[in-house]
């Protein structure tokens, strides 16, 4: 199964990351002001990807993974987050390298009125960073 073609992406991938999450974890929405784009792929389990267009307020969700093996491309202008619908292994490719000294991550709370009804849970497991968003 083909996962990705670099020639199909508008920008080159600069870094690939893996994340493992337990069912019920929400990674609250975040965005990148310097234009980092993300390509999301769930390798095992199921994940709900939630995207918010920060300019128009429009939202998009898709459940991806075992039952729907597709990748989701998110342009940098959009805020994005995910919910682990099952225990999962999640991969994301990004168009900028992460700089721990100057991170380009800006948060939006998981329960922001524009997206709070898009999650399947009302009592998620949140990291300290996501609780502080």
Residue ranges, per PLM feature:
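Non-catalytic, conserved peripheral segments adjacent to functional cores
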Residues: 1-70, 87-133
């Amino acid at each position: 199964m083909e996962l990705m073609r670099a020639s199909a992406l508008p920008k080159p991938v600069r870094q690939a990351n893996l994340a493992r999450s337990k069912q019920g974890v929400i990674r609250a929405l975040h965005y990148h002001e310097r234009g980092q784009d993300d390509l999301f792929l769930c390798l095992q389990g199921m994940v709900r990807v939630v995207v918010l267009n920060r300019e128009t307020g429009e939202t998009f969700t898709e459940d991806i993974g075992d039952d729907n093996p597709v990748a989701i491309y998110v342009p940098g202008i959009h805020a994005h987050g995910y919910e682990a619908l099952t225990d999962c292994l999640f991969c994301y490719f990004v168009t900028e390298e992460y700089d721990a000294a100057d991170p380009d991550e800006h948060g939006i709370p998981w329960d922001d009125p524009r997206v709070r009804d898009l999650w399947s849970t009302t009592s998620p497991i949140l990291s300290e960073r996501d609780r502080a968003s």
